[in-house]
Amino acid sequence: MRMNPTTSGSGVTTLDKKTLGRIAQIIGPVLDVAFPPGKMPNIYNALVVKGRDTAGQPINVTCEVQQLLGNNRVRAVAMSATDGLTRGMDVIDTGAPLSVPVGGATLGRIFNVLGEPVDNLGPVDTSTTFPIHRSAPAFIQLDTKLSIFETGIKVVDLLAPYRRGGKIGLFGGAGVGKTVLIMELINNIAKAHGGVSVFGGVGERTREGNDLYMEMKESGVINEKNIPESKVALVYGQMNEPPGARMRVGLTALTMAEYFRDVNEQDVLLFIDNIFRFVQAGSEVSALLGRMPSAVGYQPTLSTEMGSLQERITSTKEGSITSIQAVYVPADDLTDPAPATTFAHLDATTVLSRGLAAKGIYPAVDPLDSTSTMLQPRIVGEEHYDTAQEVKQTLQRYKELQDIIAILGLDELSEEDRLTVARARKIERFLSQPFFVAEVFTGSPGKYVGLAETIRGFQLILSGELDGLPEQAFYLVGNIDEATAKAMNLEMESNLKK
């Protein structure tokens, strides 16, 4: 299934002439196209506008049919800029939805929403393509096994573990470290699990997309010398793209991931940065199509659009797609319809806190706000569950005491509460960790901490064995042995100063 119609040497399309329509109206990225009676395209069909602009430059714009208006007219949304289009231009109905290349040929490459490579590394093998609109797997195909997906990040593995084949939301406002955490996860998963990842950059900064690409080349996730050996495919629809492209780029990335799951029978990681921008683009398109806005100005079809994307992200008997989605929270308000709708689909939430980021604790994951359906004794085991609950209780007690400390000071607390506060502060710092992808900024080498090692470290803090160590020894270290070594170094340094 090809995305664009082929053209013969004379420039005449090989598609039937009767599939030609004409542009009747252009309003920004929305086109109204008139077709001959009885030749109306279906909803979601790809339309191609070919011609020349006023300067004589060739134009090739792909659109997607969104509405049938009556009077033999359809309304379509453009996937690229509509500059230079004029009324009366020919429009070709391809007779099929947008289709994108899939399979091993996509690894190590950057694509746009149409599945066209944008990395200047030459054409991509398009012998295998999938349409971006597909139905979710049937009930009987779904896999219901529960197992944990180890990330090597202490705070995540201990307090809000990810489910293999699950959906995880990364919640946070602007500038608290969502994209850095995603880059670390891609790095850890490629190195520790050898899995294939697909990254969908939905409506984010072009600079960040470029930084991510360079970072992946440096870390070897993208193999420059042998591109097919790469572990990730990138699909970008950035902030400067029209809303149609930003609304569909998530589906393009998902379609590529589905091929690895269904045909190659692999476990795949799908990163979407940022799912809020998908909703935002849908809202823009909805307004352009003239639909009445719903709560807070969002589109009335918000739940349907989100559901059609999320239901395709699942585990089947063939393989799994584990999805990690960054969710921008407008004005840090978790009750906004966009994050609230996303919550309903998630197995785990990793909430990033501005307060922790301000303290310099990275990753700034809020240990009390982050949740996971996997944190149950029958899934993770009694030892992991009990340690996680005790860590949360200690941190919760510290949070309750903070007002008293602010007004009266630490000395007014009971002996037991003072001990709890001291341990909570150590735990808070031990939940920080140096990242591989942040080595350039921190100067500390990155650390991957296994789950057993993480549990052992927190048990030692909770048991009181490390009560004598200074709290700064626990800051930005990997496992607990590094913390004790750091404490000895700090002690030696202070002795030398004396």
UniProtKB/Swiss-Prot annotation:
This is ATP synthase subunit beta, chloroplastic. Coiled coil: none annotated. It catalyses: ATP + H2O + 4 H(+)(in) = ADP + phosphate + 5 H(+)(out). Pfam families: ATP-synt_ab, ATP-synt_ab_N, ATP-synt_VA_C. Belongs to the ATPase alpha/beta chains family. PANTHER family: ATP SYNTHASE, ATP SYNTHASE SUBUNIT BETA, MITOCHONDRIAL. InterPro entries: AAA+_ATPase, ATP-synt_VA_C, ATP_synth_F1_bsu, ATPase_a/bsu_AS, ATPase_alpha/beta_chains, ATPase_F1/V1/A1_a/bsu_N, ATPase_F1/V1/A1_a/bsu_N_sf, ATPase_F1/V1/A1_a/bsu_nucl-bd. CDD domains: ATP-synt_F1_beta_C, ATP-synt_F1_beta_N, F1-ATPase_beta_CD. HAMAP family: ATP_synth_beta_bact. The keyword Transport applies. It is found in: Plastid, Chloroplast thylakoid membrane. It is a peripheral membrane protein. ATP binds at residues 172-179. The lineage of its organism: Eukaryota, Viridiplantae, Streptophyta, Embryophyta, Tracheophyta. SUPFAM superfamilies: C-terminal domain of alpha and beta subunits of F1 ATP synthase, N-terminal domain of alpha and beta subunits of F1 ATP synthase, P-loop containing nucleoside triphosphate hydrolases. NCBIfam families: atpD. One of its GO terms (cellular component) is proton-transporting ATP synthase complex. Its EC number is 7.1.2.2. F-type ATPases have 2 components, CF(1) - the catalytic core - and CF(0) - the membrane proton channel. CF(1) has five subunits: alpha(3), beta(3), gamma(1), delta(1), epsilon(1). CF(0) has four main subunits: a(1), b(1), b'(1) and c(9-12). GO terms for molecular function: ATP binding; ATP hydrolysis activity; proton-transporting ATP synthase activity, rotational mechanism.
